[in-house]
């Protein structure tokens, strides 16, 4: 059984046991979170349930494994022949989760 979920403005295809990095969730490590924005559920009874836009009563339960920061991305802008430049760095926050169950 698999599902397509939406979290942090992105969509992910998940199955039970998957470990993935999603945009930061406000949850403590080793807690469970229910993701209710389920767009599609398939498998199990060989039926595909497509939401309009969400599947009614479906949710995905995930366990928070860790919180962290991604790799540093450098943004450097400059103007040729001028003494003008700007350097900025950014590290995106993420949450690593493990899918424990898909409830449809």
UniProtKB/Swiss-Prot annotation:
UniProt keyword Ribonucleoprotein, yes or no: yes
InterPro entries in alphabetical order: bL21-like, bL21-like_sf, Ribosomal_bL21, Ribosomal_bL21_CS
GO terms, biological process: translation
Domain of life: Bacteria
GO molecular function, one term: rRNA binding
Keywords: Ribonucleoprotein, Ribosomal protein, RNA-binding, rRNA-binding
One Pfam short name: Ribosomal_L21p
Any single GO CC term annotated in Swiss-Prot or TrEMBL for this entry: ribosome
NCBIfam families listed in its UniProt record: L21
Subunit organization: Part of the 50S ribosomal subunit. Contacts protein L20.
Matches recorded under PANTHER family: 50S RIBOSOMAL PROTEIN L21, LARGE RIBOSOMAL SUBUNIT PROTEIN BL21M
Family membership noted in the UniProt record: Belongs to the bacterial ribosomal protein bL21 family.
Protein purpose: This protein binds to 23S rRNA in the presence of protein L20.
Name used for this protein in its record: Large ribosomal subunit protein bL21
Organism of this sequence: Fusobacterium nucleatum subsp. nucleatum (strain ATCC 25586 / DSM 15643 / BCRC 10681 / CIP 101130 / JCM 8532 / KCTC 2640 / LMG 13131 / VPI 4355)
């Amino acid at each position: 059984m698999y599902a397509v979920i939406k979290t942090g403005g992105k969509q992910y295809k998940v199955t039970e046991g998957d470990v993935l990095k999603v945009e930061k969730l406000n949850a403590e490590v080793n807690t469970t979170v229910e993701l209710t924005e389920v767009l599609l559920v398939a498998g199990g009874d060989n039926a595909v349930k497509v939401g309009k836009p969400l599947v009614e009563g479906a949710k995905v339960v995930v366990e928070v494994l860790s919180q962290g920061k991604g790799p540093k991305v450098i943004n450097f802008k400059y103007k040729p022949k001028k003494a003008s430049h700007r350097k900025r760095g950014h590290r995106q926050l993420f949450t690593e989760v493990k899918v424990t169950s898909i409830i449809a």
